[in-house]
Amino acid sequence: MANKQAEKLITAIKKDYLKEIIKKIEELDIDKKDYIVEKLKEEKPKKKRNAPKIPLNKQCTKETASKGKCTVAACYNHICWAHMNKTQRNEYRLLKSVDIKTI
């Protein structure tokens, strides 16, 4: 939550600085003033990549330490890698190795 608020604040500050720069450039006597102002107005922030959304039927069914629902992708028997015990991990590794060898 704090990251989103910080990002919004940073983008607002960037927009304010761009507006101030555009105003100062328009006051100056420069031949290519219009070109510079257009380029500054075209300045757009790059969109950040969002994390992929995992459907509910493919998510882990265990609870986290803070009693919340685990939203990590499930690997084996609807359990994510972090919630597997050693025997389940070994079974999963064996199944994966068999799948790789058959392909």
UniProtKB/Swiss-Prot annotation:
Stated name of the protein: DNA-binding protein TRF1
Function statement: DNA-binding protein that recognizes the inverted terminal repeats of the pGKl linear DNA plasmids.
GO MF, one example: DNA binding
Swiss-Prot/TrEMBL keywords: DNA-binding, Plasmid
Source organism of this protein record: Kluyveromyces lactis (strain ATCC 8585 / CBS 2359 / DSM 70799 / NBRC 1267 / NRRL Y-1140 / WM37)
